[in-house]
Design a protein with these regions (language model features):
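Surface-exposed peri-terminal alpha-helical interaction modules
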Residues: 1-142
Length: 142
């Protein structure tokens, strides 16, 4: 039971935190230059989702399903190139190290870290909910 909770949480965060990070990036890049407050808010949210991704990647240690990695649903062979091009065209700084680290993720490492991960997972889940609520509220206010 604990193993499923940890694995599903990690996989969910890797998938949805990237999508939400990209939503914030699209907002940031799409606002007219004069909308500085909206741009700054979108940038802050994007950075928060990047931080969440970094934390999950750092602590993953193979606690995810091999099929998820094989499917390329987290990152594809085009993701890094697309991020670099987006940075060039928009001037928005995207942390490409996150994508490179995701490309290096491995599944099914030996070792039982699930119990130790529980507290981190709970914190990430709370943070993700808070960020999602904030991003949804931001999008509704536009």
């Amino acid at each position: 039971m604990m193993e499923n909770y940890v694995t599903l949480s990690i996989e969910t965060h890797l998938f949805f935190a990237r999508i939400m990070k990209e939503h914030a990036l699209f907002l940031e890049a799409g606002f007219p230059c004069k909308e500085t407050q909206w741009i700054q808010r979108a940038d802050r949210l994007r950075n928060e989702f990047e931080n969440l991704l970094r934390q999950v990647i750092q602590f993953n240690c193979g606690l995810m399903n091999h099929e998820i990695l094989k499917s390329q649903e987290l990152v594809t062979q085009f993701t890094l190139q697309a991020e670099r091009r987006t940075s060039q065209l928009t001037g928005i700084s995207i942390d490409h190290r996150i994508t490179m680290a995701e490309q290096q993720l491995e599944a099914d490492c030996s070792g039982n870290r699930h119990k130790r991960m529980r507290r981190s997972i709970d914190q990430w889940n709370r943070k993700a909910i808070q960020l999602l609520d904030e991003l949804i509220g931001f999008k509704e206010s536009i």
